[in-house]
Each structure stands twice: as C-alpha cells, then as structure tokens.
Amino acid sequence: MADSDDEYDRKRRDKFRGERESYRTERRDERRPIGGAGGGRDEWSERNPFRGGGAGGGGAPRHRPDYSDYRGPGPRARYGSPVRDMPPPKRMRSDWGDGDGRPGPRYGGYDPYLMQAWTDHYQSMHSAYHHASHPPPVRELPIIGGDTLTQPAMLNLKQFLDTQDENISDSEVMRKYTEYKTDFKRQQLNEFFVAHKDEEWFKNKYHPEDSVNRSEEQRGFLRRRTDVFVELLENGTIGSVKVDSSHGDALIRVLDTCVIKLEGGTDEDLKVLDEKPKEALVFDRKPESVDPTTVVENTPKSPKKEKEEDELPLIVSPQRIALKPVNSDDENWDDAEVEDAPPKKPEEEEPKESEPIPEIKQKQKKEKKKKIKKRKRNSSSDEESSSSESESSSSSSEEEEEDDEKLKAKYDVEDGLRAEQKAEAEKDQAEAAKAKLGSVSPKEEISPEKSAADPEVEGEAKEDGKQAEKSPKSDDEKKQENGDAAKVESAAEPATGDAQGEVKPVTIDLDKVNPPRDMHRTSSIFLRNLAPSITKAEIEALCSRFSGYLRTAIADPLVERRWYRRGWITFTRDVNIKEICWSLNNQRLRDCEMGAIVNRDLSRRVRPANGITAHKQVVRSDIKLCARIVMNLDEKFKLWSEGPLSKPSPASDSEATAANGSGSSYGFNSKNPVLQNITDYLIEEASAEEEELLGLSGDRKDGEGEPIERDEQLLSVLDRLVLYLRIVHSVDYYNHCEYPYEDEMPNRCGIIHARGPAPSRVTSNELNEYIKSYEGKLLQFLTKTALLSEDQIKDLGAKNADTEVEKFVQANTQELAKDKWLCPLSGKKFKGPEFIRKHIFNKHEEKVDEVRKEVQYFNNYLRDPKRPQLPEHPGSVKRPETESVRGPGGYRPPMYTPMSGMPYSFGGHMMGGGRGGRHFPPARRELPLEHHRRLVGYHDLDAPSNSDIFD
C-alpha cells in the first residue's frame, strides 16, 4: 500500500506541476535535473530529487525544500484544497494607502470610528437579523477600489419587529422604529464629528473661529482677483479676446496675464509673454547661462587679449586667459589694468601683482559658477566689488600717474588727502567725461570703478556671497569712512573707461535692467497620500527650507480614500524639482509616506466645448445663466459690498428673502461692471408677425434644421461673463464645474473650456434639449446654499450651550465627603457645590468658553446640508423584493452568515431560518406587516388532534 500511496501522491503532484511552475518561476530551473535530457517531459525518477543519489540523470543529490512548502505544515492532506494549487491572486497596489489594505485600524494604528467595537456589538445584538443580500460587516468587506468605509447596517422594519414584543400595535411599532432610525442617525453624526473634529480640514469648515478666518482669506483672494479683472477690463484686454477654441493663444495670454498680476508682477513682467518659452533653465545649465554675455564681450576685448599675451606672458597664466570669456567684467578690467603697469615700474609692481595671482586662481576655480549666477541675477555683484575697492592693491591702474594716485589713496587714507590731489582728481575726471563718446550718468561712472576692484579683494567679497547681497549699501558706507578717497579713485578710472568704452554700456545694461520674470510658470510636486491629521503648517515648514518654495494647496479628504488628502507644493520654475521630490520621498511626516511625485505641466489649457453653444438662442440662455451665477457668487462673498462676510442663512430666511425680492437683481443696481445693462440682452426677439403673414411654419425647420446663427454683440457680452466667472470665481462655465482652492494651486488660471467648432445645422429640438440639460448641470451654482433651520438640527441632535455648560460644571463637581467637595480642574476643595460653580466661572472661564465653542462647532456641522459623513451601508438601501429574496443577479444568496457563525438552519429556535435565503429566524415574520397581527386560522374537524390550531 505504501507504493500505491506514493504512486497516487506522485500523480497528484505531477498533475498540478504545470500550474505550480507557471507562478513559481524561481523554482522552474531547480526542478530540472542536472545532466538530464532537455525537451519533452522527463521521467518521474529523473525529476524527483528525493529518489536517491542515482536519480536525476547521474547528478549529485540536490537539497531542495520539501513539498510541504506547497502544502504548508501539518499532516499531508490526501485531497488538498484546489485554492492552494492555484496561482496567487494579483494584489493591486494602492497609490495612497500605506498598510495592509484593510479598512481598520486607520490613521496610524488607531480607529477613531470604533468600527471594530461597533461591529462586535452589532454582531452580538443582531447576529440573527443579517439579511442574505446584506454585505458582510465592515472588517470583512472586500477591498473595492480603496478602503471605502460605510455606516453600520441599520435594521429594516422586519428585522426590527423581531426584537419587539409580539403584542405590540402597529402604531407603536412605527413610532419606535422612527425613533430607532433617528437615534441611529444621531449616533452616526456624533461619532463622525468626534472622529474628525481635531482635523484641520474639518475646522476650516465648521469651527467658529477657524472657519471665519478661512472665509476671510478666501474673500481676500477673490478681491485680489476682482481688482485684476477690472484692470484688464479697463485696458481692453478682456474685450479683445473671444472665448472660442480657435482663439486659444489669445485666451492663454489673458490667463497668463492674470496670473502674473496675481503674483505681483508689473507691466515689465508681461513682456515675458512675448518671448519664446525657454526649454533649458538658466540655473540648471550653468555654462550656457552666460552665452549672451560672452558673445557681447568677446568682440571689444579681443585686442586686449592679444596685448596681454605679448606683454605679460609670465604673469597671466593660460587658465586666467581661458576664464576671461566666461567670467564677469571684473576680471577683464583687472587684466586690462595689469598689462600697462609693468613697463613703468617693473621692480615695484611685479612683486605686488604676482602675490595675489595664486590666490586668484584658486578662488576662481571654486567660485566661477557662483559669480556667474550673481552677475546674471542683479547688479549686486558690482556693488560688492565697489565696497572692496578702497582696500585693493595697486594692480588696478593702467598708467603710472594714475597708479601713483591710487596708491596714495589706498595707504594715505588715515592721514587724509592733500588739496592738490583733490584738484588733480577733479581735473582728470572732467577730461575723462569729455573724452567719452556717449553721455554717462554719475551712477554709470562708478560702474567701471566697481568692476575694477582688485581680484583678491573681490574673491573675498564673493566668498561672503549672501552677506554682500543682503547689505547692498556697503559701498556707500565704505566711501563715507574713506572720506574723499573715492573721488581720487573715480578719477583714476576714466582712462580705463576710454580704452574699453564699448563694453561698459553693455555691462551696465546687464546689471541694471532686470529681465522679465517668468512668474506664470511654476514647478510643482504632487503629494498623493496625506493623512487627515497632517496640517498645512507642517507641510509648509517641511518645504520652506527648499529654495524657490511658493505655496501649498491641500485638497479636502474623500471618503473613498479613507479621508486621506492630496496636496500640491508649488516652487519657482528655476528649481531642481526632481531633487526636491527625491528629498521629500525620503522623509515621513507623522509616520506617513506622502508619495511625492513631480506634477507635469498642463497639456491642453484651452479645451473645446459643444459647438452648438455659439447659436444665438443658446447664447441668450447662457447669458441668463451666467448672470444668475455671478449674482449668487458675488452675494455669497460680498465682493461688491463693504459689509462683513455673512454666512448662508437658514432655509426659512432665504425663502422669505427670495419671496420679497430683496436679493440682488439684474441691471443698473449692480456695481459689478459685467452686470450693468445686462437686461438689454436678455429680452428675446422673434419675427413672429412676418412668419405669420408669410405662412412660414417651424415644421420645415425642425425637419431640416437651421444653420448656426451667431450674434457677435451677444457673444461679446457672454464672453465677459464667462471670463469673469473663470478669473474671479474659478468657475469654468462651459465645463459646468468649479476649480476649488485655485489660489493655492500651482496653476492659478490653468484650464478653460471654450466654444468648439459649430455644426452646420441644428434642429430646434436639439437646441431645447441642450438648454434644458445644461441648466440642470449648473444647478449647483444657480441655487443658493440654505442652512438647516433650528427645528431641523434639533431632530439631528443639536446641543444647547447652556445645557452643555451645566453638564461641564456637574462633571467637575465631585463630592468627597459631607461638606467637602473637589474641583478636578484645579484640585481645590470647597465646602459646597455652589462654591465650585463660582470657582469654575471665575478661574476657569476659558474652559467654559471652550465648551460653548464646541457646541457651536457641532451645531455648525449639523446645519450644513452637504455635510461630510460616511455613506450608508448597502444593506440599509431599499431594494426590490425579488432582488432581496433571490439576491443580486437572481442567484440564491449563501446559506451561511458572513459573521463566522453557525448556519441559520442549525437547531433550536433557528429552525425557521435558511428557507429561501432569509436569515431572520421566526418564519411568522415573513408575512407582510398587515398580516403580522391576529391570524385567522382554519380548523378541520376531521384533522388529527395534534394539528396546529390558531386562536
């Protein structure tokens, strides 16, 4: 029998060998015997490594894991489960979750919803009432597109009846069931509030203080956008563009202009829109960043380069000559000064000039790229060299007389200068000014003096770097300390300026004229996974240490993402965004992997909408809808009024306001320029009399259709409204959506939808259907948000501030003994509870205020008709009777409970369950409600005596 068992087990393993090999590729090579014949199926004796040393084609016995690896530990099962031999199911990777993919515990190891305890409690109390069509409890739900949590399943009416007394009346049942549903909803709202009340996104919505601050911040953003729009409307930028997909470039230019204005840019910065976008960033490619400067400087300085090679071959090294084209003007001016000095005083000048040369070479190698950046960025580099000019050596002169004067100015500063030196300096300065070809301002005369600073001192100034940039006034302070020495130095420089007069204006232009800033283009990082407990301040503190950081935007959480949020971090365009992204990926915030990736630029910024929108009838309808949306949003944020921002009123107040007509209205009363005289374009016109006289009917038009009729005047009015909604309120009308928190996003005005190519003909039915359907899509903007009334929130469990304060006082009043009471807040003891009450209101007033704010916080959450909450359990949703009995798809539901309990048809009082897939035990409850009371039975006189007899 042993051989028979082995043979059976061999065949069983051989049968599933192919399936095992298909998903265990790492063991496929190990199963092949060493030296065995390739191709075809080998004999079992050759393939089996456990048959001894002679098996396997002459190879040595190999040590392989036992087949228990496939079966698992324990005794060998003769008929194993087929699941064990099947390939493992594919595990989908979640982009935003970090955990085992189960709903709980969440948020780093704790479960704020207490879903585990609730499920256990619900299983113990209602284990017999799970309907067959109900999904399993939350902890056993399959992962479907993310960890979507739901509320616990609420008992339906039939399940609730089984928990009540049999003699209860119908009215009492309905009353108790209504109370049960109300209490259930209150409990869910309260649990959700307790779970999320400490999170930033929840506070920004409902906290009495944080929500007001957030609303004021948003109102400030809108006011800034309004100012930009009015400015563009007045200068004709808005009126010169059409919201058509064929005018995409003009639309993009308008949006970019708005972004530059919102970023604080000037009209000079708008010139960047006329330039071609640069593919390579300046600071990413350092050698290429100075190409324009190098080309300009090469032409006038080529004679000087040849002269240097002839006169000073020993002093000027080949490295220094090679650095001339790419370095700033400082080194070039120094070279020009060095070349003329040795013929006059070789004994004195050469030792002084040769000393700083090795230091210059070392510093130039280290700080070459640093100097290029500073020369390209602003004119602070020249100011740094000017501040160190008074301390430089005598190597900055061209002629002997000028060099002598400069030496005296350097070393005789403490003793002062004589009057003769001052007169000579003024005379030389006047002659140099006349010799110049172009008129140079006094500020420009100092620029060659700045660039002629000693290389050694300049290198020291460059080492200071940021300190020199932060103190641009250092050159003025040096001049004040040195007295009139600056005058002598400025007199010594014009001769040098004559020799290189062509280069000096170019250098001044590069330093003084700030290039237009590319403010409408940014680099950004997308954070896929942010826990609800992470605040915006923590993200800002983490990213502010990177250069070029601008702002952070965090989206509202989504229930299908386990209330995790997404974020966008915006940087300037010139940063190395990939390096920053790599740094963020190596960091964890509150034990949460943020999942940072580089956010790509927008691909299509102007996207086409239906071309039927250009028809005159549709345009007039769109003007009405746009005007209503503009009025609602302006009134919501009080953009054109000076009053404080008010919250939406309750439903009763808003209805009364609408009935009285006291709200905003079309026409001349509005301060909004896009709404003025809007009524002139809202009146429809038709040639009704002409059609009647000529006998024209609309039947032929409906059959054949009519061509698209464009009215440019109406289109211009509509374009102003559409652009106002897009720029000010971030509402894309032709996409019937709003782009939230756009002022914090990387692209403040990124995408807009415009009218696409129009069809040749359109029927009236298509027009009417389009107008009707589009109005339904915009319903969220057309209706005002009405908060729930006081009576409505009372049904949801609203709290009273005085009642909660009283509960707070009672909770902090503890009786220790007779006439001995304790206040836990302070630890003090009192003789009576009334003294503790006074003590709490006097000494712990901030605690009482927190209780009142908490009550207002909770009530604000209840008033919101669109409040966030967990979705209802699928089992609580009403379904057709056929589906509930037979299960989804018409198939019979499983006979066992999903809660790991015994089958419902197992013994005792549960004998009535299981029939037809119903899982609630008493069979008598399967009848309709009206038949649950007082059943009239039929008693057959001929029946046996042990038959059932109804009363």
Curated annotation (Swiss-Prot):
Chain spans, region Disordered: 1-108, 283-515, 644-664, 864-893
Alphabetically ordered keywords of this record: Nucleus, Phosphoprotein, RNA-mediated gene silencing
Biased composition, class Polar residues, residue ranges: 649-664
Subcellular location: Nucleus
Gene Ontology biological process: defense response to Gram-negative bacterium; negative regulation of viral genome replication; primary miRNA processing; regulatory ncRNA-mediated post-transcriptional gene silencing; siRNA processing
Keyword Iron-sulfur in record: no
GO MF terms, alphabetically ordered: nucleic acid binding
Protein origin, superkingdom: Eukaryota
Any Pfam family the entry gives: SERRATE_Ars2_N
Positions of modified residues (Phosphotyrosine): 79
Residues modified as Phosphothreonine: 299
Biased composition (Low complexity): 387-396
Subunit architecture: Interacts with cbp20, Dcr-2 and pasha.
Function recorded in the entry: Acts as a mediator between the cap-binding complex (CBC) and RNA-mediated gene silencing (RNAi). Involved in innate immunity via the short interfering RNAs (siRNAs) processing machinery by restricting the viral RNA production. Also involved microRNA (miRNA)-mediated silencing by contributing to the stability and delivery of primary miRNA transcripts to the primary miRNA processing complex containing drosha and pasha.
Protein's name in the database: Serrate RNA effector molecule homolog
Source organism of this protein record: Drosophila persimilis
